[in-house]
UniProtKB/Swiss-Prot annotation:
Biased composition (Polar residues): 114-123, 805-820, 872-887
Subcellular location: Membrane
MF annotations from Gene Ontology: ATP binding; ATP-dependent diacylglycerol kinase activity; diacylglycerol binding; nucleotide binding; protein kinase activity; protein serine/threonine kinase activity; zinc ion binding
One GO-annotated biological process of the protein: phosphatidic acid biosynthetic process
Pfam families: C1_1, DAGK_acc, DAGK_cat
Protein name: Diacylglycerol kinase A
Region (Disordered): 64-123, 699-887
Pathway of action: Lipid metabolism; glycerolipid metabolism
Activity sensitivity to pH: Optimum pH is 7.0 with 1,2-dioctanoyl-sn-glycerol as a substrate, and 7.4 with 1,2-dihexanoyl-sn-glycerol as a substrate.
Cellular component GO terms, alphabetical: cytosol; membrane
Keyword Signal included in the entry's annotation: no
Predominant localisation class: membrane
Species name: Dictyostelium discoideum (Social amoeba)
EC number: 2.7.1.107
Amino acid sequence: MNQLNISHNWKIKSFTSITFCDHCGSMLWGICTQGFQCSDCNFSAHSHCTNLVTLHCNNNKNNSKPNEKPATITAAAASSSTTTTTTTETSTNTAASTTTTTNNIDIKNKDKTPTTSPFSSPILSSYNNNSGNEFCSNRQHKFHKTSKSITKFCNYCRETTFTISGEPVMCSECRYIAHGHCQTKVPLNCIIPYSSPINTINDGGNVRHHWVEGNLKKSKKCIHCMEPCEKSFSLAHYKCLWCHKYLHSSCFDKHNPICDFGSLSDMILPPSSIRLLSTTATTTNKIEKLIIEEQQPQLSSSPSSPRLNINNNNNNNEIIEWELIENSNMPEKVLFVFVNSKSGGQFGSTLIRKLSSLLNPLQIIDLIKCGGPDSTLQMINRYLAKHPEQTNRFRILVCGGDGTVGWLFKQMTKHLVPSTIPIGIIPLGTGNDLARSLGWGIGYDGEKLIEILKSINEAKTIQMDTWSIEMWDDDKPEDRRVIEMNNYFSIGLDAMVALGFHLARNANPQLFTGRTVNKLWYTKIGLEEFVTKNFVSLARIVKINVGTREIRVDRSIEGIIILNLGSYAGGVDLWGANRKDNQTHSDGTGNQFIDDQTLEIVGVTSLPHLGSCLSSISSPIKMGQADEIRIQVSMPSIILKDKSNEIETAFQVDGEPEPIEVRNCTFKISFFKKVSMLSNRSFKPRIENHDSDLSTFQISQSPNLYSPPSFKNPPPNLNQYQQPHQPPQSQPQPQPQPQQSLQSPQSPEPINNNTNNNNNNNNNNNNNNNNNNNNNNNNNNNNNNNNNNNNNNNNNNSNNNNNNISNDLTNNSEVNPEKSTNNEKTNDNNNNNNNNINTPFEPISLPDENNNNNNNNNNNNNNNNNNNNNNETNSEKSYTNNCDEVD
């Protein structure tokens, strides 16, 4: 058994090189005998600083036996001059032995009385190295190689790492730095991320600071005296791993030991909220075995608790089994980070190390080493099953590409994790279209993570549509496969190029090292496909149906892309920018949103056409918009005979391509659910409902039976898709009987009844407006004529809106549009008539029909007596002609 000697063994020394004091950080001046140095721990100090040093000497490197592990020393209470310490000695023949002793320690050298403090200041903490203890205090560092620098110092021998010796190492969790030859001698004092009596005060469960000495990257104010802690060429001053605040060495025994977790307190999971269940690891060192050896550590198949697989410098795998504690210390926005360490070249593993030093290491889940997110998602689900009111306290951050995000969506659905938990993204993939659509940039490139985490903390929550793709072989319809889609689905030309890129990357993954290199390879493979292959015309093999209607595929189209987002292939907007006030585009199509339960369909004619679209030189062919799509692929026998050894066509979902190897197959794309996403607050996403509420969200159960192209109001005979609507209180309420007639499915003409009833109910309300509108022309008319004009004008407005709906027009009023005040009132009345109608997608409008309908509207205004009959007939004919043109 060793007895710790805390006092430094000071000896005067003449330094042959420039040396700085390890206490105050100033240079040791003089030609000779510049200061003192501890002969045991190499602590250098001025003569006047030796009485003020608060760091205790770790001299067991000279007293320990060859096979012993040095005792662990960290911060503890120092309000008195006596403290309880524990030492551990490990023998080669025994697994572990524990001895506890009590020593009288002189905190200050030369019998100087320590400064008293109102706080219980953490100065020295001796870990209880009991192998049977549930809380494993002796926690190993997770070292990885780091660069040499003259400003980096070994926390063990206190010498600079800028030497000719081996590569220095750094702990990825506590930033402890050591030389390669000092690595096996460092104390086991890594940060404890779970509940433990070592770092948690008994009253209230508050967490103490975890101080690491020296190696400050920049100057900050001391949390006690508020004077700057200057960066020094020594191990002077301290930095807390939880709140990242600084503390002077001279203020170490005066500060408040309770940590507030700093600027990231809303997302850091405190150790007091985590209960450690078990710890399992494999080690190569001959130390006390506080954890069980396993030849091949794997995740437990039991879903009882999550496990985290962590790798350290000795190839030791540590699996920690833990659960959340039900207490009041749970932060407002707990963040669980899922990292794909294979994404983004070396950025994945680098992110894990950086995030582990900013958050609780247990919040970081390596999807590759941990075998996926299953265990963590199960733990979250079990906790929320007991506390559903705390769902809004959880957030998820995915570090990876779009494929990683899609994988996490699938696992969340599998483990019944609420889709209301918002998800943020740090993009590490090649295209990163989903991250671009939410304002998180084109890809992570070494930016400051603390600023990114602050942006995640301040992000706004929006809704995004997700879709399910059901596919089957027509010869075996019982064998069906379902894939979730978030970004896009494509078939034909671009999927063939993506498949060639995918096969080349799997064959030589070492050649695809980054986003820029991947895009160059993608271009090269696309040119090879263009030269060596003839892409089949999709009109020969593909049929696209929306409900019972078929969309005609032009003979020139070789690729069809179905979009959910406004970003494709690395940020290309194929559909085009949205118009203000939801106005239709010049081609009659509507705006694109990520939360409108509508997909956009575009086509490309050739590989040069696709390249020009990706370069924003030209635009694709807009084929329409839809909420449910069925694609039938039928390979003619002549094609299979001519090219039996080649892949005729392929499809891809969110950048994951697959060949179509069957003769006849079917794809059915339908709305699945909405998920909550985190959008950068400085970015304006393409969302239709800015104040969406999941509690009032309704999923359309029936597919629309009409052609997909776009406008936001339905044809007049879509009574089966009407949704009940309550008008605002500021507007006149309809009578109960007309409202019942509107919603009744047995009404023979529900749309016309709605129009007539609204005309009757709003007749008096519009009386004054129409009288004002017709003052110049109808001064001599009597009240009866005014009433007739009111009815006719209202009928014109409602029926004209129906005509505009069926032809994708946006006119809301036909009475004196030059008068803004009256126009606004008329628009409000028209909105009341049309808000009761809701459909997920809208048919295309044709230019000739728009002109005809405008002529019909003018005729209706001139012929008031025939409005009711003519408008209804014109609406039905207009919509019938529209469907015939699309067919």
